[in-house]
């Protein structure tokens, strides 16, 4: 059977739209064959399009030619069918299908295209290697759950655009080919043919351009924009990603945060029907680190960190008191009801925190009589043990876990252990949406290996006004006018009030170890622009991929991106990146020095 043309046929309804009210109507449907079943005198075809599946029946009594064609139909063939909608007979209604009350008796069938046998079934809940799915992404995207993810992404984008339009924002595109100003991840570079030896960079964000748009008097800007970072891909990162980018003039931090939480609440309502209470709770960076060991804490469960440093400072356990003497701290987590953990289970937890550079994991097992079982208990007085139990809110049957180290190591290790235990003990409630603003970040963080400060967010973040005098004398103590939005332990957006004065921006560059010459070379255009009446301004950027992933209940952003890259930044479908013709390189005055792989 050869392929036919549509030849004047026009779809009248989508497959998933058919219901009881269409009974008796003639419809024209188009889609793919999900499955075909031959029941002797009748052939049943489940026809699928992006809206869903409907059962089509071919009977020789209705049309002999259509029935004959249907005998040759196979999975994933592309069909057009014309027929009458009938209610299904008693006992054949399928409650698992949205269209399960009806079926279409076809009198016309056109084979629009044939299909090879797919390498995996086109259905949900398949056990298929992800690389195979990415290799045949066009088939993977046919699956209903992928259709739902793409539709959800579309609805989220539309909701965002509608909200921002209603609040006076202008959607303005910024350049994709721009100047390389590396201050974090590596740039993707694009050679210029007409300017030999010079390169553009693909933007890591539109940061500079959106600030310049505020200088230009646009006042409210937004863009749903592609951004690029040539970084070593950690878990669930992409070299190209989509950002909801916006900026506002004449605002304070609360103005930006207040409007953005309204927008996110509207997006949640529009896309998944979830009502978000506003205002969203605020937590300072310091409190987040102290209580949760993370600047993006998941607040759906407890297991908060408790500081026992003052209690343990004078104890007889050398590891603890020497840590305190060296400027470190001791914090713990109360794993409620986990006193029954075996030694191997505790050793596994010790190995877990070692990944985060913790040198060990001390523990107290609280026995049923309230006594403590621990190899280190002998180094503590009864009063110290009682004080620790009180601080940790310990009860019989609990397991107290402690890390003694530098504050950064304590936070990283116990913060990760907190989440690990919550997952293992199934303490994380499903269907809960805990949003949080984290504020008052440090402006800078010191890298001892590099021997200098780096911006915790980016170099254009404004210092807290009361901390400005410290920018030259004690930059590590300066707080930023920055704010991150966190959802269930995932950072979904971050922003700040920006620097809008040249003198402060130059002080910031100086604090980052940048000479005047280097600052002028990289950001001279920005510094010059500040001299022409820059308004106070601030903004924020949300990661659209991560936001949609959470809305969809997925575990990976790859499941909400149509054509994602692998962890090695490759596209398995197109085989990008790839070698190019030497003539193309010659035009660009470029020669590859990459080692040539020997063929086997």
Curated annotation (Swiss-Prot):
GO biological process, any: aspartyl-tRNA aminoacylation
Originating species: Desulforamulus reducens (strain ATCC BAA-1160 / DSM 100696 / MI-1) (Desulfotomaculum reducens)
Chain spans, region Aspartate: 207-210
Catalytic activity: tRNA(Asx) + L-aspartate + ATP = L-aspartyl-tRNA(Asx) + AMP + diphosphate
Disulfide bonds, paired cysteine numbers: none
Name under which the protein is recorded: Aspartate--tRNA(Asp/Asn) ligase
Positions contributing to ATP binding: 229-231, 238, 491, 543-546
Function comment: Aspartyl-tRNA synthetase with relaxed tRNA specificity since it is able to aspartylate not only its cognate tRNA(Asp) but also tRNA(Asn). Reaction proceeds in two steps: L-aspartate is first activated by ATP to form Asp-AMP and then transferred to the acceptor end of tRNA(Asp/Asn).
